[in-house]
């Protein structure tokens, strides 16, 4: 075999020339202790707050506590596989999530991984989950309605696109039912091609039973509403860090629509459980406890999340993100720590009561305690015209009803007021999964406030409403179309409506 020295030296020179000095550097630390979903890690000197780190078995975590001698990491997953002495690697990335229209119709976990068995997610890009809310200049005041399809809410406690409206009440009072009806009510809007009209829905379930979430998804699927919705689920069996991060992940997904000139609504169900998960994490990280053992920054936890809901100005695309946070109270106590915090952050609240629920008033909205601080400027002219009257009459009715319990001899005007009030209360009841369009609500409330329900027995109000609506949808559809297109109840349309209602009232009696 002939070995040529020149060839060998050429190969060696070539190898030396291409020899790189770069070494693969990855910063690693070591697990000091682990338990209850928290790991103490030594090393990782340059880790950032909120950075994603990776354990030996592939489980991920987030660096939350940066102390002098160790880093407190919350673990996004089971901590059973993680042992003392194992290595932890920096990823050099702050926690992010996939965003885009590819997520519509999907169910994902708190980090944006699919959990519905429909294959990988086609995301447009990834965005950080905890970002700064829009400043003052990009914002615009709320001006467009966000219809829920529920008469009691759209007429009396209107919500606008870009608003934050709290839904608060005890357990089993129908809080999630209101959220579900709101999602279902967006179906006709999402069937239209115009992106300005569409309203995408993001629902985040925190600390709920898996069966409840599965049932929710099933209803959306059956009603054809899943195709414009994203479900983010961090159920009761998920670790506290997952329940803490889920609302932020979902908010980022909603922000994609807001920042691209589209509209979205996000429902946090519910933030009480997120606060409990955050309290658990904070106590395990040895942060000092405050009132009700919550950490001192639990207000900031919710304020920085809810401030991300906004209506953007024309220069920034005119998009919006509406937030409907849900809070569960204990025995109607709205003066507890978390409820008062969230009430002060939001632009109004829908207050649900157990007593009303059991009286059969569903949705069980307490109209006296519920307010919408900015929604009235977003209400359509037609709704404003008929709703102003019903508000005053119901307020008088509640006042009189309290006194009427004590005295039996009531004068005629008081009796008339009580009759009208009980029929209007009956009119505001609505079965689940039957949202009404704005123009239909205007017509039935107009009939109620103009005295057409007064001669009827209370138990006939529902039948009257159903009959009137089917008559309007059938032969008199031009009245509904006129209200829908003009968003106003003109004198001409009101006269037509009057003749239809009068004719129907005579035949109904």
UniProtKB/Swiss-Prot annotation:
InterPro entries per record: ATP_synth_asu-like_sf (IPR023366), ATP_synth_asu_C (IPR000793), ATP_synth_asu_C_sf (IPR038376), ATP_synth_F1_a_nt-bd_dom (IPR033732), ATP_synth_F1_asu (IPR005294), ATPase_a/bsu_AS (IPR020003), ATPase_F1/V1/A1_a/bsu_N (IPR004100), ATPase_F1/V1/A1_a/bsu_N_sf (IPR036121)
Residues the record marks as site: Required for activity: 370
PROSITE patterns per UniProt: ATPASE_ALPHA_BETA (PS00152)
Chief place of localization: membrane
Subcellular location: Cell inner membrane
Catalysed reaction equations from the record: ATP + H2O + 4 H(+)(in) = ADP + phosphate + 5 H(+)(out)
Gene3D superfamilies: 2.40.30.20, ATP synthase alpha/beta chain, C-terminal domain, P-loop containing nucleotide triphosphate hydrolases
Binding site for ATP: 169-176
GO biological process assignments: proton motive force-driven ATP synthesis
Highest taxon in the source lineage: Bacteria
Keyword tRNA-binding in record: no
One CC-aspect GO term: proton-transporting ATP synthase complex
GO terms of molecular function: ADP binding; ATP binding; proton-transporting ATP synthase activity, rotational mechanism
Key words of the record: ATP synthesis, ATP-binding, Cell inner membrane, Cell membrane, CF(1), Hydrogen ion transport, Ion transport, Membrane, Nucleotide-binding, Translocase, Transport
EC assignment: 7.1.2.2
Family annotation (Pfam families): ATP-synt_ab, ATP-synt_ab_C, ATP-synt_ab_N
Protein topology in the membrane: Peripheral membrane protein
NCBIfam families given in the database record: atpA, PRK13343.1
Role, per record: Produces ATP from ADP in the presence of a proton gradient across the membrane. The alpha chain is a regulatory subunit.
Family to which the UniProt record says this protein belongs: Belongs to the ATPase alpha/beta chains family.
Record text on subunit structure and interactions: F-type ATPases have 2 components, CF(1) - the catalytic core - and CF(0) - the membrane proton channel. CF(1) has five subunits: alpha(3), beta(3), gamma(1), delta(1), epsilon(1). CF(0) has three main subunits: a(1), b(2) and c(9-12). The alpha and beta chains form an alternating ring which encloses part of the gamma chain. CF(1) is attached to CF(0) by a central stalk formed by the gamma and epsilon chains, while a peripheral stalk is formed by the delta and b chains.
Name the UniProt record assigns to this protein: ATP synthase subunit alpha
Source organism: Bradyrhizobium diazoefficiens (strain JCM 10833 / BCRC 13528 / IAM 13628 / NBRC 14792 / USDA 110)
Gene that encodes it: atpA
């Amino acid at each position: 075999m002939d070995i040529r020295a020149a060839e060998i030296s050429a190969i060696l020179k070539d190898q030396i020339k291409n020899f790189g000095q770069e070494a693969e550097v990855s910063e690693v630390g070591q697990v000091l202790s682990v338990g209850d979903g928290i790991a103490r890690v030594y090393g990782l000197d340059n880790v950032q707050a909120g950075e994603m780190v990776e354990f030996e078995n592939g489980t991920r975590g987030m660096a939350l506590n940066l102390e002098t001698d160790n880093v407190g990491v919350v673990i996004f997953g089971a901590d059973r596989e993680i042992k003392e002495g194992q290595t932890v690697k920096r990823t050099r990335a702050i926690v992010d999530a996939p965003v885009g229209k590819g997520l519509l119709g999907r169910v994902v976990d708190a980090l944006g991984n699919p959990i519905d068995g429909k294959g990988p997610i086609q995301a447009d890009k990834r965005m950080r989950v905890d970002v700064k809310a829009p400043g003052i200049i990009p914002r615009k005041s709320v001006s467009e309605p966000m219809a829920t399809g529920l008469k009691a809410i759209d007429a009396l406690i209107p919500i606008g696109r870009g608003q934050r409206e709290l839904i608060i009440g005890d357990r089993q009072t129908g809080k999630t039912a209101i959220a579900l009806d709101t999602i279902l009510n967006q179906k006709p809007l999402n069937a239209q091609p115009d992106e300005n009209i569409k309203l995408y829905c993001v629902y985040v379930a925190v600390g709920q039973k898996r069966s409840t979430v599965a049932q929710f998804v099933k209803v959306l699927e059956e009603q054809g509403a899943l195709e414009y919705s994203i479900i983010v689920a961090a159920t009761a069996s998920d670790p506290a860090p997952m329940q803490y991060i889920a609302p932020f992940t979902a908010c980022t997904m909603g922000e994609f629509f807001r920042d691209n000139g589209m509209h979205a609504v996000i429902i946090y169900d519910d933030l009480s459980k997120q606060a409990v998960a955050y309290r658990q994490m904070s106590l395990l990280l040895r942060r000092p406890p405050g009132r009700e053992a919550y950490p001192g920054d639990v207000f900031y936890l919710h304020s920085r999340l809810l401030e991300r809901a906004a209506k953007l100005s024309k220069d920034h695309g005119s998009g919006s993100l509406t937030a409907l946070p849900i809070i569960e109270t204990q025995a109607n106590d709205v003066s507890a720590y978390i409820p008062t915090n969230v009430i002060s952050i939001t632009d109004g609240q829908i207050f649900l009561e157990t007593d009303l629920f059991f009286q059969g008033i569903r949705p069980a909205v307490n109209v006296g305690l519920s307010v919408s601080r900015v929604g009235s400027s977003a209400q359509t002219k037609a709704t404003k015209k008929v709703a102003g009257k019903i508000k005053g009459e119901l307020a008088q009715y509640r006042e009189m009803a309290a006194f009427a319990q004590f005295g039996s001899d009531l004068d005629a005007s008081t009796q008339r007021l009580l009759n009208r009030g009980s029929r209007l209360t009956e009119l505001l009841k609505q079965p689940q999964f039957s949202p009404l369009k704005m123009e239909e609500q205007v017509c039935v409330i107009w009939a109620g406030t103009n005295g057409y329900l007064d001669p009827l027995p209370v138990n006939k109000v529902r039948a009257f409403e159903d009959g009137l609506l089917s008559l309007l949808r059938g032969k008199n559809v031009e009245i509904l179309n006129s209200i829908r297109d003009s968003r106003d109840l003109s004198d001409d349309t009101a006269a037509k409506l009057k003749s239809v209602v009068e004719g129907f009232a005579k035949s109904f009696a």
